[in-house]
Amino acid sequence: MSTIAASAKIHPTAVVEDGAVIGENVVIGALAYVGPKVTLHDDVRLHNHAVVSGLTVIGRGSVVHPMAVIGGTPQAVRHDGSETTLEIGERCIMREGVTMNAGSSDGGGKTIVGDDNLFLANSHVAHDCRLGRHIILSNNVMLAGHVTIEDRAILGGGCAVHQFTRIGRQAFIGGLSAVNYDVIPYGMLNGNPGILGGLNVVGMTRSGIERADIHKVRRVYKAIFEAEGTIRGNAAAIDRNDYLDCPQALEIIDFIGAGSDRAISSPNRGK
């Protein structure tokens, strides 16, 4: 049987399958569907015609708008059909037509979305993605499988992100861009193919990063992308001791040094 809190409000035309767990003050609108292995935490709201299926957990206060399909099976040809999961954090907003898939059998089996994220109409989160907090996916953004996006990144409308790509903290991706390679924290990328266009100085300033730290990040950026040599080699050559008081600079150095299946986006389409 389903576990449905007494304070939940479920429209008589909605379908809540036996086994679903429905928290306090959840609202489920007309013709919405909730699968038998779904958990909706307190204060979640499903608008009319929203679909939540699979082994999906949606955190407190999140909102799913009409025609969104959350928790569908992964669009991965190698998936063996086993049951995998989708975990969505608190206070996320999924607008009309958003799709999010569960993980795949060969990718860890989990798609994980953090708290306080905004997914605008028709954006897509594929299998095995890992998303942090306070991220914005604008209309029609497409994330392929295994993408990682760090906190406070913003992706403009219609951009597409290649599988296994990483997008760093507070990066800004321009609309209609093709993100083929990793994007450093605080980077700005535009175009198809995507070209690194410098640092997201406006975003850094708005988030309260001191001007002195922004200058240090610029110095690191120049040392990595404007000097002779490879991106990873240049990053490895930087003396971390010079930036111990600037976590943003160290974050860029560590992001590049962490290694990845993808190259690093640069002003020259990758070195």
UniProtKB/Swiss-Prot annotation:
The primary site where this protein sits is cytoplasm
Q: What is its EC number?
A: 2.3.1.129
Where in the sequence is the signal peptide annotated? none
Keyword Lipid metabolism appears in the UniProt entry = yes
Q: Which keywords appear in this protein's UniProt record, sorted alphabetically?
A: Acyltransferase, Cytoplasm, Lipid A biosynthesis, Lipid biosynthesis, Lipid metabolism, Repeat, Transferase
The GO molecular function terms of this record are: acyl-[acyl-carrier-protein]-UDP-N-acetylglucosamine O-acyltransferase activity
Read off the Pfam families from this record: Acetyltransf_11 (PF13720), Hexapep (PF00132)
GO process annotations (BP) = lipid A biosynthetic process
Q: Where in the cell is it found?
A: Cytoplasm
State the pathway, as annotated in the record: Glycolipid biosynthesis; lipid IV(A) biosynthesis; lipid IV(A) from (3R)-3-hydroxytetradecanoyl-[acyl-carrier-protein] and UDP-N-acetyl-alpha-D-glucosamine: step 1/6
This enzyme catalyses:
a (3R)-hydroxyacyl-[ACP] + UDP-N-acetyl-alpha-D-glucosamine = a UDP-3-O-[(3R)-3-hydroxyacyl]-N-acetyl-alpha-D-glucosamine + holo-[ACP]
What family is this protein classified in?
A: Belongs to the transferase hexapeptide repeat family. LpxA subfamily.
Role, per record: Involved in the biosynthesis of lipid A, a phosphorylated glycolipid that anchors the lipopolysaccharide to the outer membrane of the cell.
The subunit field of the Swiss-Prot or TrEMBL record says: Homotrimer.
Q: What is this protein called?
A: Acyl-[acyl-carrier-protein]--UDP-N-acetylglucosamine O-acyltransferase
Which species is the source of this protein?
Answer: Agrobacterium fabrum (strain C58 / ATCC 33970) (Agrobacterium tumefaciens (strain C58))
Q: What is the lineage of its organism?
A: Bacteria, Pseudomonadati, Pseudomonadota, Alphaproteobacteria, Hyphomicrobiales
